[in-house]
Amino acid sequence: MAWKSSVIMQMGRFLLLVILFLPREMTSSVLTVNGKTENYILDTTPGSQASLICAVQNHTREEELLWYREEGRVDLKSGNKINSSSVCVSSISENDNGISFTCRLGRDQSVSVSVVLNVTFPPLLSGNDFQTVEEGSNVKLVCNVKANPQAQMMWYKNSSLLDLEKSRHQIQQTSESFQLSITKVEKPDNGTYSCIAKSSLKTESLDFHLIVKDKTVGVPIEPIIAACVVIFLTLCFGLIARRKKIMKLCMKDKDPHSETAL
């Protein structure tokens, strides 16, 4: 009996070691999205749709699945949650570029697979295409741009590459805009400025019409105010002097009558 007990204990230890060293994939649930177990990027285009199917593998019980769009949870129908779940992303637009969809295991949300949309589209340009400014003032031409892949940006003037003057021209570029600043505009700055965006998909352009008008000669307010004050004071002094003169004449007219009465 002692020998049998020893054999049973050794077999139990062996089985315990086997279980401990089994690969995790064989003992825990694994998620797949469209057959992929790792996060991945899905290439797509505007106007298309994408179907994302999440499934749980190696499960020993029914598993609830959750879908998230960025940080917001997606509402799923009751029959679209257990062991397998799908979402359809329809009418994909340029604004969906970079958006992530994540499938998570309900009981352990650290188990997840994410899909990031890579929406490719040619450059889209917009901006205030007509500006009138006074000579000597500053102006900014802002070309709003959206593109994926990112476009190479340039400024043209009257169909030729703009010759930048370091002292007067400044270019600023962000992921969403391409800006040309001109300080102290001059009459030769008149013309059509073109915002050019070149990508591997297409080249687009947007024209900005700049009109430089003569500088308005402002009427100096201070001299006018000073002149009005002088005129006002002159009139006041004139009235005072005239009043004194009238009073003297009245006094002279009054004196002869007084002597006659005596």
Curated annotation (Swiss-Prot):
Glycosylation sites: 58, 83, 118, 158, 190
Disulfide partners: 54-103, 143-195
Segments traversing the membrane: 221-241
The keyword Disulfide bond is annotated on this UniProt entry: yes
A GO-annotated cellular component: neuron projection
Gene Ontology biological-process annotations: brush border assembly; cell aggregation; cell migration; cell-cell junction organization; cellular response to hydroperoxide; intestinal epithelial cell maturation; negative regulation of apoptotic process; negative regulation of epithelial cell proliferation
InterPro entries: Cell_adhesion_signaling, Ig-like_dom, Ig-like_dom_sf, Ig-like_fold, Ig_I-set, Ig_sub, Ig_sub2, Immunoglobulin_dom
Coiled coil ranges: none
Cited Gene3D superfamilies: Immunoglobulins (2.60.40.10)
Role played: May control cell-cell adhesion, cell migration and proliferation, cell morphology, and protects renal epithelial cells from oxidative cell injury to promote cell survival.
Record-given protein name: Transmembrane and immunoglobulin domain-containing protein 1
